[in-house]
Design a protein with these regions (language model features):
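DPxDG-like acidic metal-binding loop motif
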Residues: 61-86
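C-terminal nucleotide
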Residues: 125-242
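Alpha/beta catalytic cores of group-transfer enzymes, especially the acyltransferase/condensing modules
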Residues: 85-131
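ATP-binding N-lobe of GHMP and related small-molecule kinases
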Residues: 1-58, 234-242
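Short beta-strand scaffold segments in enzyme catalytic cores
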Residues: 2-3, 9-14, 105-109, 114-116, ...
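FAD-binding core of FAD-dependent oxidoreductases
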Residues: 1-4, 54, 58-68, 99-113
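Short, hydrophobic/aliphatic alpha-helical segments
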Residues: 43-55, 92-95, 195-206
Length: 242
């Protein structure tokens, strides 16, 4: 489960022949394995990918997955591949998983809103529900966490905590419950960073609620809860359509 932000990633794909670096993010050359895998899967390895986003990389916002998804859609248009949405989402999902940079980001991003993953897999196998909301979102980023390092280690504790949280959220699918369970999941999976923990406590003391973005040194909240706790957060909304 998660939150699809209006602060997204814009991707442009140009067919081969450019002298520009093959992949750039906010004007800087960058290596994104998930993007390379999408290009190979769609037979567009000669393409130039240009991505822009206000979101930091490695801070729990699923930027690599969003870049992979945007690349899939942009390649489909630029190269006239004539693939269906499910095909494109599946290609980006596989690329993100195989790159070790995400497990469910792409499918959730394609769904939009506050998605709940009921069953794993691409759109032809997985099942997704959602929580109705049109809330303001605030976030504060303190640093980055390596998703690949976490997912490549022992994930037994993480998986068990996730299954408990998902079951509880399905019983009560609300935005408030999502925050509470996200916070509990981070603690049970031993993922909560000190700075996010401090931010969460400050928000609680101010009468609000907050949680940690997965996987990043980032605290997020709905409404004005981070602002009310004295932080100067970035502000966006929930994007209803991914």
């Amino acid at each position: 489960a998660g939150v699809t932000l209006s602060h997204g990633v814009d991707v442009r794909v140009d067919p081969g022949g450019s002298e520009q670096p093959p992949v750039t993010l906010n004007g800087d050359p960058i290596a994104v394995d998930a993007v390379d895998r999408v290009l190979n899967a769609l037979d567009a390895s000669d393409a130039t990918v240009t991505a822009e986003t206000p979101l930091p990389l490695g801070a729990g916002f699923g930027v690599s997955g969003a870049m992979a998804l945007g690349t899939a859609y942009a390649v489909n248009a630029a190269y006239d591949r004539r693939r269906s949405e499910n095909d494109l989402v599946a290609a980006a999902h596989r690329a993100d998983v195989e790159a070790g940079t995400g497990l469910g980001d792409v499918v959730a991003q394609a769904r939009g809103g506050l998605p709940i993953r009921l069953a794993p897999g691409d759109p032809t196998h997985g099942r997704v529900d959602g929580i109705p909301t049109a809330s303001r979102v605030e976030y504060v980023t303190f640093g980055s966490v390596s998703t690949e390092a976490v997912l490549s280690g022992d994930t037994t504790r993480l998986t068990a905590a996730g299954e408990r949280a998902l079951a509880a959220l399905r019983d009560e699918p609300t935005a408030a419950r999502l925050l509470a369970l996200s916070r509990r999941f981070a603690r049970e999976a031993d993922l909560l960073t000190d700075r996010v923990d401090d931010a969460v406590e400050s928000v609680h003391e101010a009468g609000g609620d907050a949680a940690m973005a997965m996987l990043g040194d980032t605290a997020f909240a709905f409404s004005t809860d981070l602002s009310d706790a004295g932080y100067d957060p970035e502000v966006c909304g929930v994007h209803p359509a991914g």
